């Protein structure tokens, strides 16, 4: 029920990764990357399908060898989400996966080779209508830039990116996006700011090698939150040393928190104190697990007492405010006569949320049909 984010998106060109639009105001796409061995086709396909179930828009797959390229062909045939092939060192692998229907090629300027090899990749991409991501990383800058700057700096990452943007410009190829990732939050943020001021291509955001599930999510939320709040960014990936499914969840949570893109339930819950009239923490944890399948955007407030509960409920799709034995129930900001038994809170609230999601989905379907007519 909250208003849309007061953020003006940076203007950028539109490209397509498979059928997913990127840039020019398109919804910011959430990306992840497999961490299986690509040659293990079954494991990789299963992981991609698990990512699809939590709403991933694009999946990157590492293709380090020609054997992996052959496996990529089989993987591509068994999944629906667009796949990006991650290519390092051997440009010929990029040429091979292009034959197999890859949706985007990610190349690293620091190790893909000379301009002639890049030209070969670009010619192949153009022929097969495949976009490219120039992926600059603070940990793998070109040797001459390492010597020039001494260490990764925003200017070094920018120079690396622009060096290869200029090559693509000379080759009259504009179907590309760019990333300038670093593990240091401020280095990454400033690098993206400099790049955003120089080009109008779509930008892929990420804090590389951010860390484990908790620390990596925090770093990514800070870095990407700063950039997204400034309107910078067209796709994103949360790099975690954790299950890739968590990357997707955190990515959507960041977009949801900034009211840029909503998918599923935005839970608003108090941290609890001695005033709570029911088990808020247990209720929230249970509902988050039970309702993972809900993709309808809605705000659900679960507040343990009447201090802040009514106020939060007024701006929530569904709200509950703790009371003695029974708690108040709100729908679309309006208090209902019905009250929830505190001992049955989880089951009752789940039923109300599912019913509301179903009604909202049906209303959306009717609206779309009327517009189409």
UniProtKB/Swiss-Prot annotation:
Keywords: 4Fe-4S, Iron, Iron-sulfur, Isoprene biosynthesis, Metal-binding, Oxidoreductase
Catalytic reaction annotation: (2E)-4-hydroxy-3-methylbut-2-enyl diphosphate + oxidized [flavodoxin] + H2O + 2 H(+) = 2-C-methyl-D-erythritol 2,4-cyclic diphosphate + reduced [flavodoxin]
Pathway(s) this gene product operates in, as recorded in its UniProt entry: Isoprenoid biosynthesis; isopentenyl diphosphate biosynthesis via DXP pathway; isopentenyl diphosphate from 1-deoxy-D-xylulose 5-phosphate: step 5/6
Regions that span the bilayer: none
InterPro entries given in the database record: Dihydropteroate_synth-like_sf, Enolase-like_C_sf, IspG_bac, IspG_bac-typ, NO2/SO3_Rdtase_4Fe4S_sf
Top-level EC class as recorded in UniProt: oxidoreductase
Any one Gene Ontology molecular-function term assigned to this protein's record: 4-hydroxy-3-methylbut-2-en-1-yl diphosphate synthase activity (ferredoxin)
Domain of life per record: Bacteria
GO biological process, one term: terpenoid biosynthetic process
Cofactor or coenzyme needed: [4Fe-4S] cluster
Cofactor detail note: Binds 1 [4Fe-4S] cluster.
EC number: 1.17.7.3
Gene3D superfamilies with a match to the protein in the record: Dihydropteroate synthase-like (3.20.20.20), Sulfite Reductase Hemoprotein, domain 1 (3.30.413.10)
One family name in Pfam for this protein: GcpE
Binding locations of [4Fe-4S] cluster: 270, 273, 305, 312
Matching PANTHER family: 4-HYDROXY-3-METHYLBUT-2-EN-1-YL DIPHOSPHATE SYNTHASE, 4-HYDROXY-3-METHYLBUT-2-EN-1-YL DIPHOSPHATE SYNTHASE (FERREDOXIN), CHLOROPLASTIC
Function (record text): Converts 2C-methyl-D-erythritol 2,4-cyclodiphosphate (ME-2,4cPP) into 1-hydroxy-2-methyl-2-(E)-butenyl 4-diphosphate.
Family in the record: Belongs to the IspG family.
Name assigned to this protein: 4-hydroxy-3-methylbut-2-en-1-yl diphosphate synthase (flavodoxin)
Species this protein is from: Pectobacterium carotovorum subsp. carotovorum (strain PC1)
Gene for this chain: ispG
């Amino acid at each position: 029920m909250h208003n849309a984010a007061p953020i003006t998106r940076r203007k950028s060109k539109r490209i397509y990764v498979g059928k997913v639009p990127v840039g020019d105001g398109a919804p910011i796409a959430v990306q992840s990357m497999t961490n299986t061995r690509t040659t293990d086709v079954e494991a990789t396909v299963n992981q991609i399908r698990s990512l699809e179930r939590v709403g991933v828009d694009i999946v990157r797959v590492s293709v380090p060898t020609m054997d992996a390229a052959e496996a990529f062909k089989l993987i591509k045939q068994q999944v629906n989400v667009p796949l990006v092939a991650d290519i390092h060192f051997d440009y010929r692998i990029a040429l091979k996966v292009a034959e197999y229907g890859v949706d985007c090629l990610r190349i690293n300027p620091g190790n893909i080779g000379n301009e002639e090899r890049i030209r070969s990749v670009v010619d192949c991409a153009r022929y097969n209508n495949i976009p490219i991501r120039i992926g600059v990383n603070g940990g793998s800058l070109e040797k001459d830039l390492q010597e020039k700057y001494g260490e990764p700096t925003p200017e070094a990452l920018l120079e690396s990116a622009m060096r290869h943007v200029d090559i693509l410009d000379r080759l009259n190829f504009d179907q590309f996006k760019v990333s300038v990732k670093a593990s240091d939050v401020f280095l990454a943020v400033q690098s993206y700011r400099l790049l955003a001021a120089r080009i109008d291509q779509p930008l892929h955001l990420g804090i590389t090698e951010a860390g484990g599930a908790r620390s990596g999510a925090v770093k990514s939320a800070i870095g990407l939150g700063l950039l997204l709040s400034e309107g910078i960014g067209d796709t994103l990936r949360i790099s975690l040393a954790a299950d890739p499914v968590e990357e997707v969840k955190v990515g959507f949570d960041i977009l949801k928190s900034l009211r840029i893109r909503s998918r599923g339930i935005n839970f608003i819950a108090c941290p609890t104190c001695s005033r709570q009239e029911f088990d808020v923490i247990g209720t929230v944890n249970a509902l988050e697990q039970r309702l993972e399948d809900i993709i309808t955007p809605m705000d659900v407030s679960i507040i343990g007492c009447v201090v802040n509960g009514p106020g939060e409920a007024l701006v929530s799709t569904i709200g509950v405010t703790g009371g003695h034995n029974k708690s108040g129930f709100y729908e679309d900001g309006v208090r209902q006569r019905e009250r929830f038994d505190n001992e049955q809170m989880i089951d009752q609230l789940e039923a109300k949320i599912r019913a509301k999601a179903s009604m909202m989905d049906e209303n959306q379907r009717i609206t779309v049909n009327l517009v189409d007519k």
